[in-house]
């Protein structure tokens, strides 16, 4: 068993690649992350751990811009994320230089997933211990897109999805509450999904919003607090209405 446990390129007798499964476990223990695709907006949200008093919180960003029209959030090992993000940015720049056109969201997703897959079958390396949520706008159709990749190199397109810690709870919430929305409602859905698993409300949440016209913008803490207050007020009003509703006889 130990041989299959250590070797990245050797399958166990029951068909498992243990190092890939360990990388998936690193994702499950990482920060919560969520992505939501609206009709004219895409939103990324991540759980933000509290930083020491003397640390600059700007150095701990978990949402990165790959190009003017594409952004990425990840769950898992931050050092691995830095390597993958740098490789993806270089690919975006190289594509602009050689093709003279920006990459599509699907193209860069395939590139990232292909890179992750190569690290599951090469000697002297290990799988990337992170899962990514990639959002953006297609430069040709101007339509929003959301993709997810995982350490095995699998990728898929989504309307809304979550990864990282307690991702199943967030995904269940999104399945119950997702609707094709625009602007503010899309942002609120992403925040509501994170609040299902993140404690201390808005101060432990990082949100980035992208539109085709304005590109990527990270929300300030005050803006997130306003959304959280609005969500809590709506929840309180719904509970009050439920209690005040007449019981059926």
Curated annotation (Swiss-Prot):
Q: What InterPro entries does its record include?
A: Ntn_hydrolases_N (IPR029055), Proteasome_alpha (IPR050115), Proteasome_alpha-type (IPR023332), Proteasome_asu_N (IPR000426), Proteasome_sua/b (IPR001353)
- Location of this chain's protein in the cell: Cytoplasm; Nucleus
Task: Name the Gene Ontology biological process terms.
Answer: ubiquitin-dependent protein catabolic process
GO cellular component terms, A-Z: cytoplasm; nucleus; proteasome core complex, alpha-subunit complex
- In terms of one coarse class, where is the protein primarily found? cytoplasm
SUPFAM superfamilies in the record = N-terminal nucleophile aminohydrolases (Ntn hydrolases)
Q: Which Pfam families match?
A: Proteasome, Proteasome_A_N
Looking at the record's lineage, which domain of life comes first? Answer: Eukaryota
Keyword annotations of the record: Cytoplasm, Nucleus, Proteasome
- Do the record's keywords include Phosphoprotein? no
Question: So what does this one do?
Answer: The proteasome is a multicatalytic proteinase complex which is characterized by its ability to cleave peptides with Arg, Phe, Tyr, Leu, and Glu adjacent to the leaving group at neutral or slightly basic pH. The proteasome has an ATP-dependent proteolytic activity.
Please report which protein family the annotation says this sequence is part of.
Answer: Belongs to the peptidase T1A family.
Q: How does it assemble?
A: The 26S proteasome consists of a 20S proteasome core and two 19S regulatory subunits. The 20S proteasome core is composed of 28 subunits that are arranged in four stacked rings, resulting in a barrel-shaped structure. The two end rings are each formed by seven alpha subunits, and the two central rings are each formed by seven beta subunits. The catalytic chamber with the active sites is on the inside of the barrel.
Name of the protein in its database record: Proteasome subunit alpha type-7-A
| UniProt source species | Oryza sativa subsp. indica (Rice)
Organism classification: Eukaryota, Viridiplantae, Streptophyta, Embryophyta, Tracheophyta
């Amino acid at each position: 068993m130990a041989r299959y446990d250590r070797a990245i390129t050797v399958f166990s007798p029951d068909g498992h690649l243990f190092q890939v499964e360990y990388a998936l476990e690193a994702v499950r223990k990482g920060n919560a992350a969520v992505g939501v695709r609206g009709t004219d907006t895409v939103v990324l949200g991540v759980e933000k751990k509290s930083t020491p008093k003397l640390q600059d919180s700007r150095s701990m960003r978990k949402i990165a811009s790959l190009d003017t029209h594409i952004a990425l959030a990840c769950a898992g090992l931050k050092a691995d994320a830095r390597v993958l993000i740098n490789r993806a940015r270089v690919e975006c720049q190289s594509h602009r230089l050689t093709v003279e056109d920006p990459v599509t969201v699907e193209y860069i997703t395939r590139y990232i997933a292909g890179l992750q897959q190569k690290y599951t079958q090469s000697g002297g390396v290990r799988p990337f211990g992170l899962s990514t949520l990639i959002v953006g706008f297609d430069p040709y159709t101007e339509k929003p897109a959301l993709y997810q990749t995982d350490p095995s190199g699998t990728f898929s397109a989504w309307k809304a999805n979550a990864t990282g810690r307690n991702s199943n709870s967030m995904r269940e919430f999104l399945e119950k509450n997702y609707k094709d929305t625009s602007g503010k409602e899309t942002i609120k859905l992403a925040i509501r999904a994170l609040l299902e698993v993140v404690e201390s409300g808005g101060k432990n949440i990082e949100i980035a919003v992208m539109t085709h016209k304005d590109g990527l913008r990270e929300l300030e803490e005050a803006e997130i607090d306003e959304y959280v207050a609005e969500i809590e007020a709506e929840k309180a009003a719904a509970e009050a209405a439920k209690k005040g509703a007449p019981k059926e006889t």
